[in-house]
Amino acid sequence: MIMVSLIVAVARNGVIGRQGGLPWHLRDDMKYFADTTRGHTVVMGRKTFESIPEKYRPLPDRRNIVVTRDTSWFAKGVDVVGDLGEAMEKCGDGEVFVIGGGEIYAQAMHVADRLYVTEIAAEVEGDVVFPPYIVGWREVKRVPHQEGEWRYDWVVYERS
């Protein structure tokens, strides 16, 4: 059976992206992301895929599925699909991670079973936001962390 999980780092004001990238560089959070998603399928939008540094594309040790409306788009080492439903059909059983961006998160929120949220204790400027997620979810794990000037919590929510 498939379990759909969203994994995201989000500022207090909902921001998750700025000008095609992340508004922060958090090495420990990137390691958490890699450790959590390794060995699983990851689903992302084309812009998210293209925002990943080229040397890390496709994300290693994971099946990469990219959702795009551009039927001619191609990238080596990834499965390309036209919509989120098609992506879910390709996933098979096990936990699949939706990793962004904003449009894909909004579409996947209603089918998600679990959220892995890095809640950053700051408000930042940005142009991509994560959909509201407090209602309908219960917190099952919280681990506080500090990295330089950044304070954040790794939080896991399950649908209530």
Region roles according to the model:
Residues M1-L6:
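Extreme N-terminal starter segment of soluble prokaryotic enzymes
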